[in-house]
């Protein structure tokens, strides 16, 4: 799981500075992201207490995962119509070493 991967320090080795998740409070396209937050946010945060994990809700916004790395590099992944499991896999992908390139 992403929380376990991050707790092993993988994110730290990449220079991962912040994770942001943008979603809509009501849209069907953000349902999987809302499910992910309800089911997995606490575990993820407990495994990564020093990593800022920001949840940003905004009406009619397309759900998206942002990872900010050292030197201002960012990676983003659209999450529209993803299930909670797909959101988990997207998060795991941004924690991989090859993910730390600018998008």
Curated annotation (Swiss-Prot):
Coiled-coil region(s): none
Residue positions where N-acetylalanine is found in the record: 2
Membrane topology qualifier: Peripheral membrane protein
Disulfide cross-links: 24-58
PTM sites of type N6-succinyllysine: 64
Main location per the UniProt record: mitochondrion
Pfam families xref list: L51_S25_CI-B8 (PF05047)
GO cellular component terms, A-Z: mitochondrial inner membrane; respiratory chain complex I
Protein function: Accessory subunit of the mitochondrial membrane respiratory chain NADH dehydrogenase (Complex I), that is believed not to be involved in catalysis. Complex I functions in the transfer of electrons from NADH to the respiratory chain. The immediate electron acceptor for the enzyme is believed to be ubiquinone.
Protein name, entry field: NADH dehydrogenase [ubiquinone] 1 alpha subcomplex subunit 2
Species of the source: Pongo abelii
Gene name in the database record: NDUFA2
């Amino acid at each position: 799981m992403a929380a376990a991967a991050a707790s092993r320090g993988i994110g730290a080795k990449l220079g991962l500075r912040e994770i942001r998740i943008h979603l809509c409070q009501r849209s069907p396209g953000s349902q999987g992201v809302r499910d992910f937050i309800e089911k997995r946010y606490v575990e993820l945060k407990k495994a990564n207490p020093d990593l800022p994990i920001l949840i940003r809700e905004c009406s009619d916004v397309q759900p998206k995962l942002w990872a900010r790395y050292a030197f201002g590099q960012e990676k983003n992944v659209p999450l529209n119509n993803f299930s909670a499991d797909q959101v988990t896999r997207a998060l795991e992908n941004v924690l991989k070493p090859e993910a730390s390139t600018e998008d």
